[in-house]
Amino acid sequence: MFRPILRLWLLIFVPFAILPFTLLSGNVVPSTALWGHAVFHLIYLPILVVGWWALWRFVREPSNLALRVIAALILLCQTSGLLGHAGELVSVVQRGFFSAPHSIFSENPHLFFAHFGLWGIVASEVLLLILTATAAVQRLLRRPPSATVGQASTSA
């Protein structure tokens, strides 16, 4: 059960932690270079699609209802993130893509889709933590109680 969850971490959490830091924060790509934002959309959209596909497979996989429900909620949030991210990309392409003006960040279509996508992605990150904790607790509860060393049954 932990291999599919590890796959979800690699497809959902890791790209969201690395890509904004490298392309949007100004630490690697200068914050004045708006092409970093467009490249972020181009790279992150296929990652979201692959993560959505992995979630779809995960929802059908576990026999545990709690894990299926949490994974279905993550799938719903990832769908919101995917649609919001695609909407952002479309609004950036309409305004000039790599040469889009800085004012695009305050314009309604980009802003709407940015909020729509960001909150879906953040909610899926939180739900991924909950999914992992739930799977870990259920794994601990399924373990058979081990016999302690040194206890002997006494018969009187």
Label for each model-derived stretch:
Residues 26-40, 81-119:
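Interfacial non-cytosolic loop connecting adjacent transmembrane helices
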Residues 24, 28, 41, 45, ...:
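Alpha-helical and His/Cys-centered functional microenvironments
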Residues 2, 55-63, 126-156:
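Cytosolic juxtamembrane helix at the C-terminal end of the final transmembrane segment
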Residues 51-89:
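Loop-to-transmembrane helix junctions at the membrane interface
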